[in-house]
């Protein structure tokens, strides 16, 4: 590749003109998985250089309206107290049940419900054992792999993007 290059951490505020160009993206970490779908429609050709497949999940973040923000501010003391008592200091509490103690249908329903929520609920409000090595983690990992396969239409490419060498949560999930 020749021409301009840029690290995503130093992306120009005015952007880069990539229309009609051959573009290479090195890596499939957090920045890359946000960048790739944004530039893919405008470039002539996109090559992604991936060493290791990563789990990827949408955060579904969005703007917070003024009423909600005021509610948050009014409840700062309670929010900070709760965050001091939870994993990762987030406003989420693990479901005290084991994923393997409920039916496969109930697990899937919870996984899907949490997948649709914003923020880290899909990790930190899930069954207590999905973030630990073992059967529950593998079950949830397969759910996330399925989401990757759903999103990537080419099955050959999808399999290249599905992590097979580490448990879910062992690496930061972009």
Task: State each model region's role.
Residues 1, 14-15, 28, 43-174:
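N-terminal FAD-binding dinucleotide-binding subdomain shared by FAD-dependent oxidases/monooxygenases
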Residues 1-42:
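Glycine-rich dinucleotide-binding loop and its adjacent helix/turn
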